[in-house]
Curated annotation (Swiss-Prot):
Family: Belongs to the HIV-1 VPU protein family.
UniProt keyword annotations, A-Z: AIDS, Apoptosis, Host membrane, Host-virus interaction, Inhibition of host innate immune response by virus, Inhibition of host tetherin by virus, Ion channel, Ion transport, Membrane, Phosphoprotein, Transmembrane, Transmembrane helix, Transport, Viral immunoevasion
Record-given protein name: Protein Vpu
Record-linked HAMAP family: HIV_VPU
Stated regulation of activity: Ion channel activity is inhibited by hexamethylene amiloride in vitro.
Topology in the lipid bilayer: Single-pass type I membrane protein
Gene transcribed to yield this protein: vpu
PTM description: Phosphorylated by host CK2. This phosphorylation is necessary for interaction with human BTRC and degradation of CD4.
Assembly and oligomerization: Homopentamer. Interacts with host CD4 and BRTC; these interactions induce proteasomal degradation of CD4. Interacts with host BST2; this interaction leads to the degradation of host BST2. Interacts with host FBXW11. Interacts with host AP1M1; this interaction plays a role in the mistrafficking and subsequent degradation of host BST2. Interacts with host RANBP2; this interaction allows Vpu to down-regulate host BLM sumoylation.
Species whose genome carries this gene: Human immunodeficiency virus type 1 group M subtype C (isolate ETH2220) (HIV-1)
Length: 86
């Protein structure tokens, strides 16, 4: 066992450590990006729900929430409540 460790060059260990570090950074970056997407989607869903509730209560849609929602999803004119099956 000691002979096996003596044959391992320290450069291989350093390269393996660097590769593992790069892989860890890539994985955590992807996880963070997906987490941000999830938070954004939850916020959009909350705004859609609030807009629908206000439209049901008042008979018209809330322009403030619709405008905020359209800026979040980068659309000019978002017509969420023009669905025939509501």
């Amino acid at each position: 066992m000691v002979d096996l460790l003596a044959k391992v060059d320290y450069r291989i260990v350093i390269v393996a450590f660097i590769v593992a570090l790069i892989i860890a950074i890539v994985v955590w970056t992807i996880a963070y990006i997906e987490y941000r997407k999830l938070l954004r989607q939850r916020r959009i869903d909350r705004l859609i729900k609030r807009t629908r509730e206000r439209a049901e209560d008042s008979g018209n849609e809330s322009d403030g929430d619709t405008e905020e929602l359209s800026t979040m999803v980068d659309m000019g004119n978002l017509r969420l409540l023009d669905v025939n099956d509501l």
